Amino acid sequence: MEKDKILVAGATGYLGKYITRELLSEGFKTKIIVRNPNKIEFGDDNLIIEKAEVTRPETLKDICKDVRVVISTVGITRQKDGLTYMDVDYRANANLIDEAKKNGVEKFIYVSVLNGEKLRHLKICEAKEKLGDYLKSSGLDYCIVRPSGFFSDMGDFLKMAEGGRVYLFGDGKFKINPIHGEDLAKAVVETIHNDKKEIDIGGCRVFSHNDIAELALNAYSKPVKIVHLPDWIRKFILWFLRKFTNSKFYGPLEFFMTAMAMDMQATPYGKHKLEDYFKNQVNNARKLPRSENECMNK
């Protein structure tokens, strides 16, 4: 029996690559939208590559033809190239939803962010939640997947640990269970055949910020030195950024510094361990020539 055709938007991104590989390994006919086909690093008999840009609706005509499910990881961390969060996280995904409806797509799966409903006052979450509202009112069957954060989002802990000391706001007791992209991809693909409308998901182990700082220092074989900064410093930095910089600059920092002052803990899932990820990152960095290592850490 031939499997359903799935469309992946955002397939060249970190999570999108894992989702595409997972779909292909499960035998799904997989169509991916890319701006530059040359960026695709893998091939498969079931892989269909379509050149299009989700921010330009005229390039999406019939992109969803014969597709049963659309999976979108489209979104930006930093606003660049003249594009805002509203342009990409909301409008580009809304373009896809409109095209999906025209072509009779049955289900739309969107990867958002944990606690986005509580963080609508942040620019990035405002756009993601507006898209979530649009999807819910679209008439399509849908699932909104809300990950707690990726292992790769913990990179700042490693950067500080390399210098021998990790700085945290507050007492470091807020909880988070970040997830590896491969584990999240499996969970996303599983939603194709279940009827859950929203899923909060994180990695297999819950950590405090102190725990993560200790793991990062251990990865560098450094003594555990954690400095706890008073939370008013975090609040002042947020105020300063909003007052004296534009949203293009402060958007990603605004989200990061707000999320660091709340629990970002979700249903545990997966098998990858953060400590293994940290050790691999450190080992890989040590294998690089000095100039390449400096570039990687920027």
Language model regions located:
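N-terminal Rossmann NAD(P)H-binding glycine-rich loop of SDR-like oxidoreductase domains
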Residues: 4-26
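NAD(P)H-binding glycine-rich loop region in Rossmannoid oxidoreductase-like domains
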Residues: 7, 38-95, 99-102, 115-117
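Non-catalytic, hydrophobic alpha-helical segments
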Residues: 15, 70, 184, 188, ...
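Glycine-/Pro-rich loop/turn segments that contact NAD(P) or position catalytic residues
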Residues: 76, 80-162
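Glycine/proline-rich active-site loop of Rossmann-fold NAD(P)-dependent oxidoreductases
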Residues: 152-159, 190-199, 222-224
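Substrate-positioning beta->alpha
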Residues: 170-192, 197
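Substrate-binding strand-loop-helix patch
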Residues: 175-182, 201-219, 232-239, 272
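A hydrophobic C-terminal alpha-helical subdomain
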Residues: 231-298
